[in-house]
């Protein structure tokens, strides 16, 4: 008789099935989230839940979405975007060199689209591009649609709301001139190749879910992809301990500059 699947065995099966290695996440937090889903679907044990994931594509999509923590909002944490608009972007665009921006863990696209709006107001002679990546293909599909409920637009400045959104049937549709400036791509931050030559990288509210060892590994890889003088922005509730170890210098809360 086969032994009942435990959490370690479940992690192994999930990694093989969807490529997500749960061992990099904080165990207590991740187990709690999985157990919440199991209760919702009335799965008494890991074996039962795994069968559900294998048999029902909707449950699997919900599982992937739930574990990859897809929360997003346009211009979330307004102080960060004020710093971007007033200081960081003008400094990076000085001299007319092309600007490469990467939004990692972009969720439904609110962050990279917010960046594209800010960049569209800079000197029109400046060249820039925004890359947005996420693990969840279903979320990326929603991001490419550019269709949002009103509650995600709470912090959108009025000038951007009027210029770049059209309301239909209670939803807000993003104008194609902004949508077309963002390139979306699926990426597993734990295993896939990282971008290089970036001037600005944002990975916000992602590190809090990982173990300390994984956090440090990701920060090191992000820093390697950043040009000297470029900026790295994390979540306002996150912090990089000893940023100099990674060649970073703290500029403001959640904002770091690569110094070497």
Q: What residues fall within each predicted segment?
A:
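Conserved AdoMet
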Residues: 2-102
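Conserved class I S-adenosyl-L-methionine
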Residues: 96-109, 128-131
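Extended basic-aromatic, gly/pro-enriched interface segments that bind polyanionic ligands
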Residues: 128-202, 206-217, 239-241, 260
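A short glycine-rich, Lys/Arg-flanked "PGG" loop and its adjoining helix->strand segment in the class I
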Residues: 216-228
């Amino acid at each position: 008789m086969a032994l009942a699947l435990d959490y370690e065995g479940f992690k192994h099966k999930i990694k093989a099935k969807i490529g997500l290695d749960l061992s990099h996440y904080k165990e207590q937090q991740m187990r709690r989230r999985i157990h919440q889903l199991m209760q919702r679907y009335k799965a008494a044990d890991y074996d039962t839940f795994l069968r559900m994931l294998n048999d029902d594509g909707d449950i699997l999509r919900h599982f992937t979405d739930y574990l990859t923590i897809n929360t997003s909002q346009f211009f979330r944490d307004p102080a960060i975007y004020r710093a971007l608009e007033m200081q960081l972007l003008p400094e990076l665009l000085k001299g007319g060199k092309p600007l490469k921006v990467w939004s990692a863990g972009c969720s439904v696209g609110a962050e990279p689209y917010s960046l594209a709006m800010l960049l569209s107001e800079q000197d029109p002679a400046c060249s820039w591009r925004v890359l947005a990546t996420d693990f969840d293909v279903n979320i990326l599909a929603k991001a490419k649609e550019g269709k949002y409920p009103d509650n995600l637009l709470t912090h959108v400045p009025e000038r951007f709301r009027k210029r770049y959104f059209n309301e239909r049937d209670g939803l807000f549709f993003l104008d194609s001139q902004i949508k077309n400036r963002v390139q979306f791509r699926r990426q597993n931050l734990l295993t896939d190749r990282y971008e290089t030559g970036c001037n600005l990288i944002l990975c916000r509210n992602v590190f809090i879910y990982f173990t300390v060892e994984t956090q440090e590994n990701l920060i090191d890889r992000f820093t390697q992809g950043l040009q000297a003088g470029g900026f790295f922005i994390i979540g306002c509730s996150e912090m990089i301990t000893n940023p100099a170890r990674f060649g970073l210098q703290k500029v403001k809360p959640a904002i770091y500059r690569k110094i070497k």
